[in-house]
A protein has these predicted regions:
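Gly/Pro-enriched, hydrophobic low-complexity segments
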Residues: 129-131, 138-214
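N-terminal export leaders
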Residues: 3-7
Length: 215
C-alpha cells in the first residue's frame, strides 16, 4: 500500500508543468474552451462539497530539499500544516490570516498571504473562475490550473494540480517573483472527517516575533 502511494505521488510530482519553472511575469487571463470550463465547474462543485481534509504532505523547494508532515483543513479558512520532527514548526490559520508557530520556542509570526496559495481553496464555496487563471495543462490523469496574483512583492503564481477523474486536489506549486518554487504534494488523504477544534489554535501566550528576512 505504501509503495503504491509513493508511486502515485511520484507520478503527480512529475506532472509539474514546465511553465511553472520559469521566472514569473505578468500574463493575461486565459480564454477557456467549453470543455475546460466544464472541467473547472466540476472541480469547483466537487471540492466545495468537501468540508474537511486530513492527510500527509511532501514539501519540495527549489534546491530539492524535502520535508514531510501532516495537514488538517476545515472550510472555511481553518488550516494546520504540522512539519514532522525534528521541526517544531507548524502553519496555522483560524480564519484570520496565517501564522508560523514554533512549539519549542513558543513563538509565532504572521505568514505572508501571498505565500499561501491554498487560500484560493479555503472558502466555503470554491470558485476558481474568480481567480486570474493564466494557464491550463492537462495529461491523461491530471489537470493543472495556474493562477496568478499581483502582490506588493511582485507577481506570484500557483499551479493547482487536480486528479481528472476524482477532481481531488493532489498538488500545488508556488512560484515566487524571483522564480523560486515550493511544491506541496498530498497523499493518504481522508475527507469529511471530524477534526478536533483544538487543532486550529494559536496559544495567546506565545511571543510574537518578526518573520525571518527570507520569508
Amino acid at each position: 500500500m505504501l509503495r503504491r502511494t509513493f508511486i502515485a505521488l511520484a507520478a503527480v510530482t512529475a506532472f509539474i508543468p514546465a511553465f511553472a519553472q520559469s521566472v514569473v511575469g505578468q500574463e493575461a487571463p486565459r480564454e477557456l474552451t467549453d470543455a475546460e470550463r466544464q472541467l473547472i465547474t466540476d472541480i469547483n462543485t466537487h471540492n466545495s462539497g468537501v468540508k474537511t481534509m486530513v492527510g500527509r504532505f511532501l514539501q519540495i523547494d527549489t534546491q530539492g530539499q524535502r520535508i514531510e508532515g501532516t495537514f488538517f483543513i476545515e472550510r472555511p479558512g481553518k488550516v494546520l500544516f504540522r512539519y514532522n520532527p525534528p521541526s517544531y514548526e507548524q502553519i496555522v490559520s483560524v480564519g484570520r490570516g496565517f501564522y508560523v508557530v514554533d512549539r519549542k520556542e513558543q513563538t509565532q509570526y504572521a505568514y505572508p498571504q501571498d505565500k499561501v496559495p491554498l487560500r484560493q481553496f479555503l472558502d466555503a464555496e470554491i470558485d476558481l473562475f474568480k481567480a486570474n487563471l493564466v494557464a491550463i495543462n492537462q495529461s491523461d490523469d491530471y489537470v493543472s490550473l495556474t493562477l496568478q496574483d499581483d502582490t506588493p512583492r511582485g507577481v506570484v503564481r500557483v499551479a493547482l494540480v487536480f486528479d481528472i477523474e476524482s477532481k481531488d486536489l493532489r498538488q500545488w506549486t508556488l512560484t515566487e517573483p524571483s522564480g523560486n518554487e515550493l511544491t506541496f504534494s498530498l497523499y493518504d488523504v481522508e475527507y469529511d472527517v471530524t477534526i478536533p477544534k483544538a487543532y486550529f489554535y494559536i496559544d495567546p501566550t506565545f511571543r510574537a516575533v518578526n518573520a525571518p528576512p527570507n520569508t
